[in-house]
Amino acid sequence: DIGEPGPREVLIRTAAAGLCHSDLHFMEGKYPFPCPAVLGHESAGVVEAVGSMVHYVQPGDHVITCLSAFCGHCSQCTDGHLSLCENKGTELVRQPGEPPRLSRSGGEPVNQYLHLSSFAEQMLIHEQALVKIDRDMPLDKACLLGCGVVTGWGSAVYAADVHPGETVAVIGCGGIGLSA
């Protein structure tokens, strides 16, 4: 079962989801994660409903999910260091006493992988865990932007310090390698 959107949450109809190697690591038990859980973190979909405080998106908007969600108002976020958000573990999840976003029919909570769980027909996520995209962008391609594309691009630009016009060799031609 999936809950109703809280004040800063968005309900999304999943249109496409990529299978990342990170998902495979969790499925194989190489990375610990509490079960039951719904995996998946590369996804695109269409907004179905929004919480009372959400103003960035509205029903019908096309969106991609972001695994690097942030609160938007702590000192790290306001200083432009979104990946260092001080409130990731508190504000982006439901609090004790609140109904879970995902649950089994008996009410048992189901954990959300990276606060997303895109291997489901619908996702209920924090508003800061998505980005609105142009309606003309194919959702089956857009879903790869949230992890593989930004990981490959970030590896080339930030880790390898590659600049326009330079020649590089990329070893591997998966989604990340092709995006580097």
Range-by-range predicted roles:
Residues 38, 42, 114, 118, ...:
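Conserved active-site and cofactor/substrate-binding residues in soluble primary-metabolism enzymes
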Residues 59, 109-111, 139-143:
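Flexible, glycine/proline-enriched loop segments at strand-loop-helix junctions
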Residues 121, 128-130, 134-180:
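Mid-domain Rossmann-like dinucleotide-binding core that forms the NAD(H)/NADP(H) cofactor-binding site
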